[in-house]
Amino acid sequence: MLGGIIDTITGSSKQSRLKGTVVLMRKNVLDLNDFGATVIDGLGEFLGKGVTCQLISSTAVDPNNGNRGKVGAEASLEQWLTSSLPSLTTGESRFGVTFDWDVDKLGVPGAIIVKNHHSNEFFLKTITLDDVPGRAGAVVFLANSWVYPADKYRYDRVFFANDAYLPSQMPAALKPYRDDELRNLRGDDQQGPYEEHDRVYRYDVYNDLGSPDSGNPRPILGGSPDTPYPRRGRTGRKPTTTDPDSESRLSLVEQIYVPRDERFGHLKMADFLGYSIKAIAEGIVPAIRTYVDTTPGEFDSFQDILDLYEGGLKLPDVPALEELRKRFPLQLVKDLLPAAGDYILKLPMPQIIKQDKEAWRTDEEFAREVLAGVNPMMITRLTEFPPKSSLDPSKFGDHTSMITAAHIGSNLEGLTVQQALDSNRLYILDHHDRFMPFLIDVNGLEGNFIYATRTLFFLRGDGTLAPLAIELSEPMIQGDVTAAKSTVYTPASTGVEAWVWQLAKAYVAVNDSGWHQLISHWLNTHAVMEPFVIATNRQLSVTHPVHKLLSPHYRDTMTINALARQTLINAGGIFEMTVFPGKYALWMSSMVYKNWNFTEQGLPADLIKRGVAVEDATSPYKVRLLIKDYPYAADGLEIWHAIEQWVGEYLAIYYTDDGVLRGDAELQAWWAEVREVGHGDLKGAAWWPRMDAVSELRDACTTIIWIASALHAAVNFGQYPYAGYLPNRPTVSRRRMPEPGTEAYGELGRDPERAFIRTITSQLQTIIGISLIEVLSKHSSDEVYLGQRDTPAWTSDARALEAFRRFSDRLVEIEGKVVGMNGDAGLKNRNGPAEFPYMLLYPNTSDVTGAAAGITAKGIPNSISI
C-alpha cells in the first residue's frame, strides 16, 4: 500500500511522513494599514512552535478517547514556501508542514486540529496533504477561518477535509468531532456579551435600534404577534437602563459583534465599506448640516443638482472630519476624507443621466423603470376596473379608486376598458393600500406630505407601457373611519399641467422608493436571510452537503446587517433621515412582514401571483410572461432556472430518495429551527414546506439562493445608477400638489424647476442619501459572483464539481443572451429613452479578475454582502 510513496517515508525508521502545505493570511495584511501590499517580513514568527497541527484519523478510533478518531503527534509549520508554487493572492503566505503519520496504524486523516500559540490571530485558508496512501488525490482541509490564540477558546479548533457527508454517512471516527463543532457554534450555554474572537450563532429580536436611555426609543421588532420580525444574530450586550428589554447600543467606532468568521475576512472593499458608512454617518453628515445651515439650504434648479456631479460641493471642514482622518486608515477613506484643505464632495454621474439629462422626465422612462428599474417587482395586472381596495371597510370605509373610463379611454389604442382588461393590457402600480394605513402618522413628521398612489399603465402594441392616470390619495378622518380624499391626474405635455403631471409622477416615485428601500431591499432580502444564515451554522455541519451548497450565499450578510443596525436603520440613522417613513419605517416593515410568505419569494411564484405571468407547460420555464419585454422577469427566469437546475443536480447526488431526506437529522433540525425560531413569529403559517421530499428541499434552496443573489442584485446595484439623481427617484415629498388659484400653482408656472425641487427631497436629505447609495451600489474587487467560488477545492466530490461547472457555463451563456437582448432594437424596454441598458441581472460569472469593481450596474454576487 505504501510502495508508491517512498519519497514520503524515511526508510530507516519505517515511520511514515505526510507532507502538507498551509495557506494563511496574517492579521496585519487584513488590517489594511498597508493596504494591498504583500507583507513578507515577520513571517518567521509562524515557524517553530508558533502554530501546531495534529491530524485526526477518519478510519482508526481511539477506544481510550470515546472511540474518537485517533489524533497524531503535533507538527509545526516549516519554511516559508515561495516562488516554486502557483502565485498567491496578495497577502497569502504558504508554509510547509510534515506529519509523523503511520497510515497502517492511523488510517486516512479526515480532520485536523490547529493551535495558535501567538498573541495575534491569523486567517487560515487551507491545509493540503498531497500524497496520502489509500486516498485518491489530495486531502484538502478547508478552513477559511480566523484562528485566535489557543487560550481564547474552550475547545480545540478542528477543521475537516473537504468531503461531503450526510450525518448518517459520516465516518464514525469523525462523528463526535462533527457534533462537538456544531455544539460550539450554537453556544447555547454562552450568554454573552460576546467578544471579537467568539464564534457563537444565536438569535435575538430587533431590540437594539432605539436609544431609550437618551429618550429615543423604538418598538422592539420580533417576538410578538403585534410586531413580528425575522430574528437577527445575538450579541449578548447589556440591556439599557430605562428599558430592560432593549439592548444597549455601541458607539459608531466600536465593532458590533458578529460570529468571527462572518466578519469581512477578505481583503479590499469590505472593510472600506464599513469605514465609508461610518465616515458618512459621523463626518460627512455633520459637514453637510453645517453647509446647509450656512447657505440658502436648497437647490433652485436641476442644474444645481447636476453640479454635484459636474463640479462637486465644497463642504466646511468640521471637527468631526478631522477626527475621522486620525482614526481611520487613510488608504481606505482618502476619497471620502481628503487629507487636508477644502473638502469637496464630488459624486460620479449616475447612469440615468449620463447619455441624456432630460430622458428621466419622459413618460416612457417612467414606465420602463417599473419593468427594468431598481424596484421592478411591484407591477401587477389589473383584473377589475376601477381598482378596488382590500383595506378593512370597518376602519377605512370604501377606498375604491376614483379613476374612471373617461380618464383613460382615449389612450387604449382603440380598445374599450373591458377589452383592454380582457386582453391583459391594463396594469397597475398600486401603492394605495400599502401606505394609506400609515399616512396620518407619517404626515405628522416634520417636512412630510406623502400621498398614497395608484398608477395605471397600458401595454402598447410595441411592447412598452404607457402611464394612463395617477391617483393621489390622502387620509381623511370621518367619524371612526379613515376615508380617502383622492384626485386623479392624466398625462399632459404643455404648460403648467405638464409640470403638475411631472409632480404626480414624483409622488409615485416617492412611494415606490420608500417601499423599495424598506421592503423590497431591507426586509425581503437582508432581514429575511439572516435567520437562514444562523440556522445553517447552528444545525448543519460544514461537512453537510447542504451547508456546502448554501454557505457561499451567506458571505458577509450578518456583518452588513449588523452595520445597518448600527448606522443605517437605527433611531436617527441615515435611513430615518433620508426616507419618508422616518421613525415609523422599521415598524412599518414589521406590519408588512406579517404577510411574508417564503414560498412566494421565488420568481415564478411571484410573477404568477402578480398576474404578469401564467403557468404554461409549453413555455421554456413553464411560465409565460404576459408582458414579453419585461427585462427583470425575462432575465430573472433564466437565472432562476439555472439555479434550480444546479440545485436539483447537486441534491440528487446525496439524496437518492425522499426517505434519505426524512432521515437526515441535521437537515430536519435546520428546517425546524428556521421555521420555529428564525422566522418563529410566522411558525404557524400553513404555507411552510414540511420538508418531507427532496423536491421541497430543492425549492427551498433555490429560493434561498435566489433571494441572496439575484433578487438582492436586482434591488441593490441599481440604487445609485437610477436614484443617484434624486429628481428621478425622490425619497420624500414635502408639500401637497399645487391646486389652481393657489400661490404654489403660480410658482409652478413661474419657476417650475424650483417648485418641483422644493416639493421633493430636501438638499440635506439629498446629499446624505446619495452619498450613502453611492457606497452601497459598488461591487468590490474581490466580489464572488454567482457561478463562482472563492475556494476552488470547496468539495472533494467530482460529481458536485462537474454539476457546478455546468451551472457556471449556463450563467456565462445567459450573459450572452442578456447582451443580445439589450442589442435588439425591437425590445424597447431594455434601454429606454435614457439609453441605459438593463444589466442588473447580467451574472458577471465570466469576470474572474475583479475587473468590474465599483458602480457597474451589473453582476450578481453570491450573497447579500452590501
UniProtKB/Swiss-Prot annotation:
Its cofactor is Fe cation. Pathway: Lipid metabolism; oxylipin biosynthesis. Coiled coil: none annotated. Fe cation binds at residues 521, 526, 712, 716, 866. One of its GO terms (biological process) is oxylipin biosynthetic process. InterPro entries: LipOase (IPR000907), LipOase_C (IPR013819), LipOase_C_sf (IPR036226), LipOase_CS (IPR020834), LipOase_Fe_BS (IPR020833), LipOase_plant (IPR001246), Lipoxy_PLAT/LH2 (IPR042057), Lipoxygenase_dom_3 (IPR027433). It catalyses: (9Z,12Z)-octadecadienoate + O2 = (9S)-hydroperoxy-(10E,12Z)-octadecadienoate. SUPFAM superfamilies: Lipase/lipooxygenase domain (PLAT/LH2 domain), Lipoxigenase. Keywords: Dioxygenase, Fatty acid biosynthesis, Fatty acid metabolism, Iron, Lipid biosynthesis, Lipid metabolism, Metal-binding, Oxidoreductase, Oxylipin biosynthesis. Its EC number is 1.13.11.58. This is Putative linoleate 9S-lipoxygenase 3. The lineage of its organism: Eukaryota, Viridiplantae, Streptophyta, Embryophyta, Tracheophyta.
